[in-house]
């Protein structure tokens, strides 16, 4: 299937919905690959994916506390996703994503904040080690103490 066939241009009213789960893993073994392939083939989602991004190299040489992005020592970032057309299909595809992600999780829990959906504060916390979270909360308290800019993957200011 070519890319234009995935999202045909000028298709009025077409607004796909996505559900996804992001994580970091330290190992992808044969059983994990077979699980991915079996689940992808079995899914009826209009588009489904397991995206694997190999990490390491220069980014792994940056200390965790040098920036807000952490988990630099992890081997892979994985994103499991399903796209569908009708809101009621979430009942089918959200559990599919969650189950497949749980089967692939290897190592400590983590998340890439740029791929998080509306998953709650616990998942936002998964994106940052405690020291990074605390540092971001202190910065937020200094520059946005009323938490005006909160309609995002929010780190609340210290003291709230």
Language-model segments: what does each one mean?
Residues 1-160:
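Soluble FAD-dependent oxygen oxidases
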């Amino acid at each position: 299937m070519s890319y234009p066939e995935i999202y045909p241009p000028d298709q009025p009213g077409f607004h796909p919905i996505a559900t996804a789960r992001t994580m970091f893993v330290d190992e992808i073994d044969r059983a994990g690959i077979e699980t991915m392939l079996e689940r992808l083939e079995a899914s009826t989602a209009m588009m489904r994916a397991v995206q694997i991004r190999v990490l390491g190299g220069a980014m792994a040489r940056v200390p965790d506390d040098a920036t807000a992005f952490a988990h630099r020592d992890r081997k892979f970032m994985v994103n499991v996703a399903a796209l569908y057309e009708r809101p009621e299909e979430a009942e089918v595809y959200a559990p599919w994503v969650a189950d497949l992600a749980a089967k692939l999780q290897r190592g400590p829990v983590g998340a890439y904040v740029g791929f998080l959906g509306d998953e709650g504060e616990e998942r936002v916390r998964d994106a940052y080690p405690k020291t990074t979270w605390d540092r971001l909360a202190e910065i937020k308290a200094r520059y946005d103490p009323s938490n005006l800019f909160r309609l995002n993957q929010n780190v609340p200011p210290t003291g709230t």
